Curated annotation (Swiss-Prot):
This is 4-hydroxy-tetrahydrodipicolinate reductase. NAD(+) binds at residues 8-13, 33, 97-99, 121-124. Pfam families: DapB_C (PF05173), DapB_N (PF01113). The gene is dapB. It comes from Geobacter metallireducens (strain ATCC 53774 / DSM 7210 / GS-15). Pathway: Amino-acid biosynthesis; L-lysine biosynthesis via DAP pathway; (S)-tetrahydrodipicolinate from L-aspartate: step 4/4.
Length: 266
């Protein structure tokens, strides 16, 4: 039985991961929160609403990592890298669902993962990862004859923009078309900005209300348009996906993996 520790255990996502881990038959061995959090010392299961687990929420990273097989982290890139470093020192696996990583931060994550198995994915949803595969195939088939635009929608509390999932969708399309995403991504259009270039991939962001997450990639040709969309109705798909990744990654060879590896989509 896999022993899972959860970082950000008192947050919305952390609570759903605890519930998902219990439902999957895993052992919730630890629950981590930032020092000074008001719920430190409380039973993680009671806070998550799944019944007492006998696991107190802790602010001691090293103790939590010591007691687990794998740590699941949905926080921020800065915190995730700190947790990844702690796991690397103790030879424990980690699953990271945080978004907003810069290329430099992602490179550092890959370096730290040389000694342990780690899953880093902007979206743990099975459906979204199937979309990644579909986007690759569609982009290769359509080639340069269709313009590509991406629109993503999230709740008004989301801190980063565009979403990590939207960026990854853009990267997948760019790679399939032989383009450098960082050079062709267009995040801003305003005023007299000139005609759209053939190579660019447009990115639009919407924030409002309680939208869990919606992504649509438009392939726009002359007289026709293809739309590939994914809509998240609940955060449970992310929590279930992260637990699935945690069960998969324990015992794997060191290295940085993503959900395409977990789901066997490569």
């Amino acid at each position: 039985m896999v022993k899972i520790a959860v970082c950000g255990a008192a947050g919305r996502m952390g609570q759903r991961i605890i519930v998902a881990a219990k439902e999957a038959g895993c052992t919730v061995s630890g629950a981590l929160e930032r020092p000074g959090h008001e719920l430190v010392g409380q039973d993680a299961g009671l806070i998550a609403g799944c019944g007492a687990l006998g696991v107190a929420i802790s602010d001691d990273l090293n103790a939590v990592v010591d007691g687990c097989d794998v740590l699941i982290d949905f926080t921020t890139p800065k915190v995730s890298l700190k947790n990844l470093e702690a796991c690397a020192l103790k030879k424990k696996a980690i699953v990271i669902g945080s978004t907003g990583f810069t290329p430099e931060e992602r490179a550092l994550a890959a370096e730290l993962a040389k000694d342990i198995p780690a899953v880093l994915a902007p979206n743990m949803s099975v459906g979204v990862n199937v979309c990644f595969k579909i986007l690759k195939d569609v982009a290769k088939t359509l080639g340069d004859d269709f313009d590509v635009e991406i629109v993503e929608l999230h709740h008004n509390k989301k801190k980063d923009a565009p979403s990590g999932t939207a960026v990854r969708m853009g990267e997948v399309v760019a790679e399939a078309l032989g383009r450098d995403y960082n050079k062709v991504a267009n995040y801003h259009r305003e005023g007299i900005c000139g005609e759209r270039t053939k190579e660019e991939i447009g990115m639009q962001t919407v924030r409002g209300g309680d939208i869990v997450g919606e992504h649509t990639v438009y392939f726009i040709g002359m007289g026709e348009r293809i739309e590939i969309s994914h809509r998240a109705m609940t955060r449970d798909m992310f929590s279930r996906g992260s637990v699935r990744a945690a069960q998969w990654v324990v015992g794997k060879a060191p290295g940085l993996y993503d959900m395409q590896d977990v789901l066997g989509l490569r």
